[in-house]
Amino acid sequence: MSPGGPPEGEKKRKSIKEISPIDVYKLLPRTNCAECGEANCMAFATRLVNGELLLADCPPLFTPEYQASHEKLDRLLAPPVRTVTIGTGSNAINIGGKYVLQRHDFTYHNPTPIAIDVHDLMPEAELLDRIRQIEGFSYNYIGRTLTLNAICVRSVSGDATTFGNAVRTVIRASHYPLILCTLDPAVMAAGLAEAKEHRPLIYAATESNWKEMADLALAHKAPLAVFAPNDLALLRSLVKTLLSCGIQDLVLDPGTFVEEGLPDTIANFTAIRAAACKQFDELFGFPLLGVPLTVWTGTELSDDVLKWRETLTASVLLSRYADLLIMHSLDGWVLLPQLIWRFNLYTDPRKPVSVEAGVRTFGRPRSEEH
């Protein structure tokens, strides 16, 4: 068992595949009150284990009489990878919440949101135009509308006022959830001052700035990304420290390396997710952030080559457990493969993809006399 697994003598946690409806039923009120909409508590337990219902669908569980049972069910059914919410209200996105390493073992929840970057040195007209492109990008696929999901605001200037102004402009122009990207706590504070009601993702806490970033995350009740490039031991250490500070909503970035570094990236993402889902390592039980955008910071090549590499990197990270992606390109041939692959990856393998049944008219049928 890894250092993040259960202590010696503690009962090993069950995976979602090992939890039976009986395990859940024993902790339910067992009154068959039907407030959940099911005929009895056993039917509710069965659908709960299958991920079709939530504990919140059982009102009696939230009364003082059943508080102990509610807490036990929370622990029993909690996913090994925590769910983290970015944004607020109807515009919020959930990332993580994974139960299994391999999709076919159960199903994947919370399809990977794709964020597109903007930066604080863009002229306002260019910034607003890019926001319109991000929000306007959509594609109809098998009756579903596929879209982008978030905006990442990067500090290129390194200036707090400039960054704050850019964040303000984005908030006024867009309803999308935000990722604020700077390693300078003073610059981040300016961005958070503009986005304090929007619960953005703070990117990122590192070995050198974790204390200041932790204070900002606590003050603004915002999720915090943890960045330790190609150093899983440091990543675990930072997570442990931040948890001890009282921060529960963390997102892990082990670094996105391209070209010769891509195998290391795949290995790191896989190791983290395997530790969480197979060994129940709580320090690695957080959503993973992939940044295909990094292809634009490497070797200077033609735009088409860089876009192709970004496409490749994004597809690989989607396949290897990334719960959130930050990208740069807005070309259809770069984004559509990600949106379509995401849709197919996050379909429930227990339920075939289908379209609404019905009779449809094609053309103009003529009467027999014609």
Where are the language model's segments positioned?
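Non-heme iron-sulfur electron-transfer modules
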Residues: 9-20, 46-75
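Immediate flanking context of iron-sulfur cluster ligation sites
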Residues: 18-35, 50
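Local cysteine-cluster metal-coordination motifs and their immediate loop/turn environment
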Residues: 29-47, 56-60
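Active-site beta->alpha loop and helix N-cap motifs at the rims of alpha/beta catalytic domains
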Residues: 77-236
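Active-site glycine- and acidic-residue-rich loops that bind
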Residues: 227-235, 256-271, 305-308
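C-terminal helical cap(s) of enzyme catalytic domains, especially alpha/beta-barrels
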Residues: 265-269, 331-352
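Active-site-adjacent loop and "lid" segments of alpha/beta metabolic enzymes
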Residues: 282-323, 327, 339-341
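Conserved small/polar residues in nucleotide/adenosyl-binding loops
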Residues: 369-370
